[in-house]
């Protein structure tokens, strides 16, 4: 089990300057925040520290600035939404280091919340530059990392600061790490993984790691076609990476060696065009017409997947089973997700899901709140599933 300090380990922090790394990389349209999910996720940590009398100093990046500061990527655009979610005044500073930051921090009272400017306005952030890290650390007494979604990056505000200040995991980071530990670290068995999405090429490391750790691996989405084709079955005009047939075979061999069952679709929903309401039919997977494409797994496959979910004590899910954005090719994803949610709410399954499309798919199915844990961290969640060490997490464990 990862061992890290949490807010429970912080005693008297009244008047202490607490630097909190948060993820405020939210979508903005016409100057307005369109989705406050990430702000809502970090609110408990911020408010807990504020209520305990700390001076709460928020560090975050926003977008990918190319050459220093740019007004459209200023965190001052996000501040009103942060205030709204927290229902608490939030002041801002025009920089995250130097005189502007120092004077804003000096003006704080106990319990105040200050949002410093975009850390990526300085090249030292992404380079994890020691001088830049020291300049950030100068404004704090304690460091709290609550940005799991940026933990796969060894940047100054996500990794470097933990070498300069006492380091703790915030509540979101803590919840994420505890959920992930239940998912793959030390899970209740049997463990079933569902991996979908379009391409095998983006998930080779993930699949290779999972077959060594789970009892069954369900492969869906466009990537299933690559595995089906690798077995010598014609997949018609379906999305398929034929050049990765050998990679798919290697993954299947590794699975057999590790005692992991690979579950591929038995049937598929096919169409001749990729559009909502397109004429479609369900065929066995070895009867795909040459002029058709598979856009979802079929009902027999969903039954088989549900049977594996029923057997499982733990489910890890990344990626949709079909082209869920377009009806009726959302049926398999919705069906399997609803069954997993049902088992979870009945207390019979620990279900952990993550990755951008996965969150959208579970929201589409209306069951995201019924899973044990749904991670909003894209890249960090995938790298964790690939078995890679995350710098932002490793440094918290070291700080223990």
Swiss-Prot record:
Keywords, sorted A to Z: ATP-binding, Cytoplasm, Glycolysis, Kinase, Nucleotide-binding, Transferase
Pfam families per the UniProt record, alphabetical: PGK
Enzyme Commission numbers on file: 2.7.2.3
Cysteine pairings via disulfide bonds: none
Transferase recorded as keyword: yes
Gene Ontology MF: a single term: phosphoglycerate kinase activity
Pathway(s) where this gene product acts: Carbohydrate degradation; glycolysis; pyruvate from D-glyceraldehyde 3-phosphate: step 2/5
Catalytic activity: (2R)-3-phosphoglycerate + ATP = (2R)-3-phospho-glyceroyl phosphate + ADP
Residues that bind substrate: 23-25, 38, 61-64, 120, 153
GO cellular component: cytosol
Subcellular location: Cytoplasm
Transferase as UniProt keyword: yes
GO aspect biological process, one term: glycolytic process
Chain residues that bind ATP: 203, 325, 355-358
Xref: InterPro entries: Phosphoglycerate_kinase, Phosphoglycerate_kinase_CS, Phosphoglycerate_kinase_N, Phosphoglycerate_kinase_sf
Superkingdom of source: Bacteria
Protein family according to the UniProt entry: Belongs to the phosphoglycerate kinase family.
Subunit field text: Monomer.
Protein name, as recorded: Phosphoglycerate kinase
Encoding gene, per UniProt annotation: pgk
């Amino acid at each position: 089990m990862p061992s890290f300090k949490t807010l429970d380990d912080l005693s008297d922090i009244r008047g202490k300057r607490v630097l909190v790394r948060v993820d405020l990389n939210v979508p903005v349209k016409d100057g307005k925040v369109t989705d406050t999910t990430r702000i809502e996720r970090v609110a408990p940590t911020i408010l807990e520290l504020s209520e305990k009398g700390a001076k709460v100093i928020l560090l975050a990046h926003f977008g990918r600035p190319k050459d220093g500061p740019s007004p459209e990527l200023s965190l001052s655009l996000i501040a009103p939404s942060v205030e709204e979610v927290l229902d608490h005044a939030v002041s801002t500073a025009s920089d995250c280091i130097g005189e502007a930051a120092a004077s804003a921090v000096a003006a704080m009272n106990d319990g105040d919340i200050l949002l410093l400017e975009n850390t990526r306005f300085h090249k030292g952030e992404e380079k994890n530059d020691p001088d830049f890290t020291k300049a950030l650390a100068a404004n704090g007494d304690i460091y709290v990392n609550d940005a799991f979604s940026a933990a796969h990056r060894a940047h100054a505000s996500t990794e470097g600061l933990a070498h300069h200040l006492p380091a703790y995991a915030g509540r979101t980071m803590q919840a994420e790490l505890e959920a992930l530990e239940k998912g793959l670290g030390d899970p209740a068995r049997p463990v079933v993984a569902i991996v979908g999405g379009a391409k095998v090429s983006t998930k080779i490391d993930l699949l290779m790691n999972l077959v060594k750790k789970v009892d069954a691996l369900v492969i869906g989405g466009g990537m299933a076609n690559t595995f089906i084709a690798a077995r010598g079955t014609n997949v018609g005009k379906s999305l398929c990476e034929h050049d990765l047939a050998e990679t798919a075979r290697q993954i299947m061999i590794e699975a057999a060696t590790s005692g992991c069952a690979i579950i591929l679709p038995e049937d598929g929903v096919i169409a001749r065009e990729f559009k909502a309401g397109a004429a479609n039919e369900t065929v066995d997977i070895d009867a795909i017409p040459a002029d058709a494409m598979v856009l979802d797994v079929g009902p027999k496959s969903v039954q088989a997947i549900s049977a594996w979910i029923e057997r499982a004590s733990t489910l890890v899910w990344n990626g949709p089973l079909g082209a869920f954005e377009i009806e009726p090719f959302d049926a398999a994803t919705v069906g399997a997700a609803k069954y997993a949610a049902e088992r979870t709410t009945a207390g019979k399954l620990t279900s952990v899901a993550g990755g951008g499309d996965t969150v959208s798919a579970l929201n589409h199915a209306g069951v995201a709140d019924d899973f044990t844990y749904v991670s909003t961290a894209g890249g960090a969640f995938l790298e964790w599933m690939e078995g890679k060490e995350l710098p932002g997490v490793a440094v918290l464990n070291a700080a223990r």
